[in-house]
Amino acid sequence: MINRFKKPLTVAVAGCGLIAAPAALANEPSLNIDLRTFYFNRDFRQGSAEDSVAASQALRVDYASPYVNGLIGFDASLFGAVKLDGRGGDENSGVLKADGDDTEGYATLGQAFLKLKLGEATELRAGRMVLATPLLYDDDARSTPSSTQAIKLDTRLGGVDLYAIYSDRAANMAETSFKKYQANGEEYELYLLGGGYSFDNGLSLQAAHGVADDYLRQTYLNASYPFQLGNGDSLLLDAHYYYATDDGDLYGRDYQSSLFNLAGSYATGDLTLTLSYQSVGGDDGYDYSWDGFEHDNNVLMTWNSVQYLDFNSDDEQSLQLRADYEVAAVPGLSLMGRHTEGWDIDTATHSDAEERETNLEAQYAFQRGALEGLSLRARIAHIESEQFDNVDEIRLIANYGFNVF
């Protein structure tokens, strides 16, 4: 399954650092504003799918309150976007709100939650929020992020970060209403538990388990370890494992699948080289969405889940070679190139189908002066697949963020 509203680059790179219990809960108010200009162009080189072009000017306003009497507070975020352009199948781009076969701008209260401070390292939140956990991660790869209606408890016990989540609704990117999770006309709810621990030697471990009542059950494990090689060089080993089964009749069939990803990332000076292998086992491709991407826009936390493809099809194996370069002569400029090759895919018509994706990215963040806080980013993808359409895709993004107080 493809999640065509894919995650930003930083999710895959930072997959081992997602859990952060509020060890020192902030007690000062803050107001942050982020302006994002987003251009999207997807060209289907063959098949019946309609090409799409979309552009938006988005606004995100984040307010965080202090804790009244050191106990209770309220945070809120406004998400909005104005339509600049929309052509072809832009209703499927995720950049703008779909209105039948057309698109339009939108505004929504993307976050609005009460927060209760229960000690120095424990916080309870209830309401709409943008989540960033391995099994429930709100995507921010378009104009504004997706969001989840939930109750979330974060705590730290003996150096272990722990969390528990209950959720009954979600809103996809560019959606203005939160919809209940449902399948086959029946509604259900999500329950998740997770945690992580970082050792003094750099070893990081994470685990999470989630259940969608009578629909789907998922487990996630992650281990990462950095080796210091001398002369400033380092090697990061990062392993991810997913396992999923149906949880009852709502899934519609018996389902069992697993996914394993192992990456080695070698850094020397301004250059980082990564080699990543991924394999899918079980009876089917790996399904990581809690509702088939209707409203939950979850992301897959592996290196081989890239701009367009996830390389998570039935029995698929994939290998990625990636290079990242920080241009020392131009502070703030970073470049990335990667190629991912998938094979052994089982489909209705092939027992050994192949697919491949090549990505090029460039990003520049202004370092000083009046433009400090502005970043410019270009993302290019070239996709060839024997099970999906061949695609060329361009995304151009300008972000400008600043703190009001």
What kind of region is each of these model predictions?
Residues 118, 138-145, 169-172, 185-187, ...:
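Solvent-exposed loop/turn segments connecting transmembrane beta-strands
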Residues 53-57, 106-110, 145-149, 156-158, ...:
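Residues that define the transmembrane beta-barrel architecture of outer-membrane proteins
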Residues 70-74, 120-124, 159-164, 171, ...:
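Repeated loop/turn-to-beta-strand initiation elements of outer-membrane beta-barrel proteins
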Residues 284-350, 357-367:
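C-terminal structural cap/anchor segments
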Residues 11, 15-128, 155, 325-328, ...:
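Beta-barrel outer-membrane channel/assembly domains of diderm bacteria
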